[in-house]
């Protein structure tokens, strides 16, 4: 039986996953629904937490693989990803230029992503990072999987940049090049975009420096994606999986990940049932709004 995309045509399809901290759980639910409906990608482009999810998917682009990714997310705590202690805070105050160690992210990658180099993924994967000196994007498609993802998730100020050749790489969310542009540059003619969304139902700023930085990044990413889609060459097809709305919580809060996954599965199932993959449009949930 042909999938919806098979019926549309053979053009190269990219899954595009941007950042969003703990809201990356939303992408896991979206991937689950897409996989359950037999919808797959010819390439994956990821930035920030989307780099982590995209790289895992590229290693096992099956429903069983996405279910394993969901199990990982359901078991995550904030400390697993952002390992902080009084010692790290004091070290930051005295002599370090970063607040959080990369050890949490690195362990997550080493424990769960089965391939060590990007070029060994089952589906081509491209990781978007930012040269912290120039602001230019640096796209990694080969070499160490761990180093690429660690770099793409390195929020400036919270994590140290990663030295790479003549660059110092940081979070792909602040890049001059969005994952949408990268997917097109890599030859994709059809984009399926999996946004994490932003905390549109929040009533007050998050508590803490890292939480505020992540919240600001989710707002920036949402605006970037909308702008890029509005400027996209009309020859490129795109379909945006609607993010959760209303979305409660903080991208620094990992206590709601199971709910985010389950809601995203349900909303993506409904979107597909309503022929979402035949309607290229920017959902209102992606545009700036609040409740």
PLM feature segments, named:
Residues 1-47, 55-291:
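Patatin-like phospholipase
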